Amino acid sequence: MYEYHSKLEATHPWQSSWYEWPTMIRPMYYYCQTLRDGMKEGISAFGNPLVWWAGIPALILILLPFGRRRSNRLGSKTSQWLQSIGCEFLVFLALWSVFVKQSSSNGGGDSWKLYGPFLIVLGVASALYIAYQLVTRGDKKALFMVFAYAVQLLPWILVPRCTFAYHYFPSVPFVAMMIVYCMVKLVDSDKKWFKWCMVYLAVAFFLFLVFYPVLSGQPIYEQ
């Protein structure tokens, strides 16, 4: 599997990188056909903006409590230092993957073949250490959602081949869970948030109805 994904050099006009998926910068376009009577049908792959975009602040809000909690145990400073090193390495790994994507599109990619396995091992070790710190310091429910989301998304950082927006779909259920988790926390802190949460859900459902024809291939009038 690694050999296939690391050596595939094909490109596609609708390809997109992992860092573009949460913001839907490059959706996937499958099919379009003009029908009789001024109608058209098409199939695309993209998400609900109010779900995918809201997932970004939801993830940040979930991670903030982890950063605020302090440990009084002996060696906590060393632990925090190691955790910061792990986070910095994951950021470096993400930036490296962007560089590899660009070099591969220009005919390069030898750097990934040389350093790829080593970076994978360090990336997994850093992620596991950070996960251990979150387990001992944070909310277990929030940790599960963040960990599941990361497991679905982060491996694509290590894939130099062309990728598409639909590779993000397995992460979307956990995005929705993180949004609901944040909504519950907001409502618990202040009941006034309840009506705004209901407005958000109603608008998100409305957008689903609006986009459904171009997601499912339902014929619609061109205008």
Mark where each language-model region is.
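Alpha-helical transmembrane segments of multi-pass membrane proteins
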Residues: 121, 148, 169, 173-180
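Alpha-helical transmembrane segments of multipass membrane proteins
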Residues: 153-157
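Lumenal/periplasmic acceptor-binding loop at the mouth of the active site in multi-pass
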Residues: 1-70, 96-99, 105
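Transmembrane helical bundles and short interhelical boundary loops of multi-pass, membrane-embedded
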Residues: 77-138, 178-180, 185-223
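Membrane-interface helix caps and helix-loop-helix hairpins in membrane proteins
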Residues: 158-165
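Physicochemical signature of membrane-embedded alpha-helices that form the seven-helix bundle of GPCRs
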Residues: 167-168, 199
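Transmembrane alpha-helices of multi-pass, membrane-embedded glycan-processing enzymes
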Residues: 54-58, 123, 175
